[in-house]
Design a protein with these regions (language model features):
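Active-site neighborhood of glycoside hydrolase catalytic domains
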Residues: 283-306, 323-360, 393-395, 399, ...
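C-terminal beta-rich recognition modules with glycine/proline-rich loops and embedded aromatic residues
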Residues: 40-75, 346, 413-422, 427-518, ...
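Long, well-ordered core segments of solenoidal/helical folds
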Residues: 108-139, 179-197, 244-261, 291-311, ...
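Extended ligand-binding groove/face enriched in aromatic
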Residues: 138-151, 157, 167-298
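Low-complexity, Ser/Thr/Pro/Gly-enriched N-terminal "stalk/linker" regions
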Residues: 40-155, 180-205, 240
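Well-ordered alpha-helical segments within folded domains of soluble proteins
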Residues: 105, 149-168, 218-234, 269-284, ...
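Solvent-exposed loop and edge beta-strand segments that line ligand/cofactor-binding
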Residues: 139-156, 208-222, 258-273, 305-340, ...
Length: 680
């Protein structure tokens, strides 16, 4: 028995529940899919299909659950979309209003820009042209954009998003022209197909296979990337044609999904679909047409959302990057409706991933999956060397921005900073802009990079997006206050208040940052400076060179309200210290951090075969062995026996070991490295 049309409180929702061992993997197997095919696309090493390692398959089958819940079930009744938009507590600035200056963010953005401009539009559009029956002489791309890869077309969507964000941030005409050219090419293909708005680089037969439960590689995943890219081109690059093409695609999705029963659609959702819910909610938001939100509601995967709504971590065995985008979509629905189920599940999901499933870098997963119960990373880390899929870090950062906007809690920015500094800035190769698929935590691992024309992994795509919009989280604001979240050289223009502020810093090489008011109204306003959780109570602030009596509490904001004048300067000092961070279930396995920076032991990359440099992840058994020593603690604190190296910023050396090692930030480590150590 289920309840219908009854408003339920959080308290009623959280009643007891029971589980039976039939879940996503079993359901998808019965539906004609392999467990991995139903849950994710991430490690396809051939062009058409992927079978996960036996260990991952076994864990999928053992761990997934189908929830049986004491009534009322959270999603028993059909969803009804009722617009009741949330007013977020904090809002980000438009990309054009935050200008990056010298430092790691502007470098990464430039490398990424050059990577994108090095891929010709006719090559990107080739598969779309062929699918539409249009002539093309363009040379095909390889990897996941090869003509026989079932995920072909996804990177084109990522490219559109990257071009849109780059243009929004820089106003550069060349990058806008690239994005506009792709949109025009896609519109041409859509008109030629003339199929109710359908557009992709593969035929609708892929969706017929999805409908019949036959193996196919995530067609809605690819559609989402294209639709999201079109959305971004409209929102950030003022391309009206992009909205027209997107609306046509949404119409096709609406018609296709509307023809399925609720039960059948739930089975279809066992195959990875990216953030289809999110992009449809976004389209509803900008058009005011709730038709698209109702279409987005059809992508509510109840088997996954129900445990989260009941605050139960049943993530073991699930493919991480299948599910994080689904939660981002849930967060977006909460913002449009204030339906607490979607807000609660987004919050709980973030909490359980970041508190019980997170490595020191802020990343999560092994072999693309959560392979263990919460707080068992000591077991998971040893299963394979393919830790921390980069797409997952990117999408967790997207989710963080939603939650931070709702609450304004500094802890979200502590997490965001950790992922950005260690994971995201640590996986883009200087100059080439080539990026990795995984960030391995295996001792003696190395970073394996994509190539210019023959990879196009999912993580190549999310990386292209991310490094285009690195200015989007440094500052937020409410009606009265400017929030300084991250410490990078930059300028912000708060147009509504007539405020301009410049941040000068060489953080993290330096413990200081300086905020200079360049323009201010006569009325008072507030500046809130994040005091990171990693600093000490000895943090200090100065206003116009005079010490302030107040110190900020680590993990909060220092609030300064005054009638600011042009030339006012705030200097913030955040002492950094060296700390050890053990795994919860194995305290002898530890990572070391300096402030927010994860440190990595440095080992030479000697005699590593070239072909091992460009795989999706490090193949440890095929590489020459590296001897990573165990360490013996020589004091109560890590700083007692790991000391800075004079004259070498952010470089440290152990002392008193049988074999001492040098440590540098992981994001600067391009040899072989070790992050976690056996410490006695």
């Amino acid at each position: 028995m289920t309840t219908k049309n009854r408003k339920l409180s959080r308290r009623v929702f959280a009643k007891g529940l029971a589980m039976t061992p039939l879940g996503l993997a079993a359901a998808s197997s019965a539906w004609g899919q392999s467990a991995a095919g139903a849950q994710g696309n991430a490690t396809a090493s051939n062009q058409t299909a992927w079978t996960p390692p036996a260990d991952a398959r076994k864990l999928d089958m053992e761990a997934d659950r189908r929830f049986v819940v004491a009534e009322p079930e959270p999603f028993a009744a059909p969803l009804v979309f009722t617009r009741n938009e949330l007013r977020p507590r904090l809002r980000p600035f438009a990309l054009r209003d935050v200008t990056l200056e010298s430092g790691p963010l502007v470098d990464a953005r430039a490398w990424n820009r050059n990577f994108l401009l090095g891929i010709a539009n006719d090559r990107l559009l080739r598969n779309f042209m062929v699918n539409a029956g249009l002539p093309t002489n363009a040379q095909p791309l390889g990897g996941w954009e090869a003509p026989n890869c079932e995920l072909r077309g996804h990177f084109v969507g990522h490219t559109l998003s990257a071009c849109a964000h780059l243009y929004g941030a820089t106003g550069e005409a060349e990058i806008k022209a690239k994005g506009d050219g792709i949109v025009a090419g896609l519109a041409h293909c859509q008109r030629k197909l003339n199929d109710n708005g359908y557009l992709s680089a593969f035929p609708t037969e892929f969706f017929d296979r999805l409908d019949r439960g036959q193996p196919v590689w995530a067609p809605f995943y690819t559609l989402h990337k294209i639709m999201a890219g079109l959305y971004d081109m409209h929102e950030h690059a003022d391309n009206q044609q992009a909205l027209e093409v997107l609306t046509g695609m949404a119409g096709w999705v609406d018609a296709w999904t509307a023809s399925k029963s609720e039960e059948h659609m739930q089975q279809i959702l066992n195959v990875e679909y990216g953030g289809m819910n999110e992009v449809l909610y976004n389209l509803a938001a900008i058009t005011g047409n709730d038709r698209w939100a109702r279409t987005g509601d059809r992508f509510t995967k109840k088997i996954f959302f129900t445990p989260l709504a009941l605050r139960s971590d049943q993530l073991k065995g699930m493919h991480m990057n299948t599910h994080v985008p689904e939660v981002i979509g849930a967060a977006r629905r909460y913002e449009l409706t204030q339906d607490f189920r979607f807000g609660d599940m987004s919050q709980f999901f973030f909490d359980t991933v970041t508190q019980a499933r997170m490595y020191a870098t802020g990343g999560s997963s092994n072999n693309e999956h959560w392979l263990v119960d919460p707080d068992h990373l000591g077991t998971e880390i040893a299963i394979s060397a393919h830790h921390q899929e980069c797409c997952c870090a990117y999408n967790m950062m997207k989710l963080t921005r939603h939650l931070y906007g709702w609450q304004g809690d500094a802890r979200y920015m502590d997490y965001y900073e950790r992922v950005l500094l260690n994971h995201r800035l640590g996986v883009i190769e200087p100059e080439s802009g080539h990026t990795t698929y995984f960030l391995s935590m295996a001792p003696g691992a190395w970073k394996t990079l994509c190539t210019q024309f023959d990879s196009f992994w999912c993580c190549t795509g999310t990386g292209a997006e991310e490094y285009a919009k690195l200015n989007n989280t440094i500052y937020y604001h409410d009606n009265d206050a400017l929030y300084v979240n991250l410490f990078f050289a930059s300028r912000v223009h708060w147009r509504e208040r007539g405020v301009r502020v410049r941040q000068r810093t060489s953080f993290p090489e330096s413990e200081q940052t300086e905020l200079i008011v360049e323009e201010s109204p006569a009325e008072p306003w507030t500046m809130r400076l994040r005091i990171p959780a990693w600093t000490t109570a000895a943090n200090a602030a100065r206003l116009n060179s005079k010490p302030l009596d107040v110190a900020g509490t680590p993990g909060s904001y220092l609030t300064l309200t005054r009638r600011w004048k042009q030339g006012d300067r705030v200097e913030l000092t955040m002492p950094m210290r060296l700390t050890a961070e053990p795994l919860r279930d194995d305290p002898t396995r530890q990572a070391f951090l300096y402030g927010p920076l994860v440190l990595a032991g440095q080992f030479p990359k000697v005699a590593l075969p070239e072909h091992l440099e460009h795989l999706q992840g490090p193949e440890m058994a095929a590489a020459p062995p590296v001897e990573v020593p165990a360490l013996k603690a020589r004091g109560a604190e890590a700083a007692d026996w790991i000391k800075p190296v004079a004259g070498e910023p952010l470089t440290f050396r152990t002392s008193g070991q049988q074999r001492d090692v040098t440590l540098k930030p992981l994001n600067q480590s391009w040899q072989r490295f070790a992050v976690y150590w056996d410490v006695t």
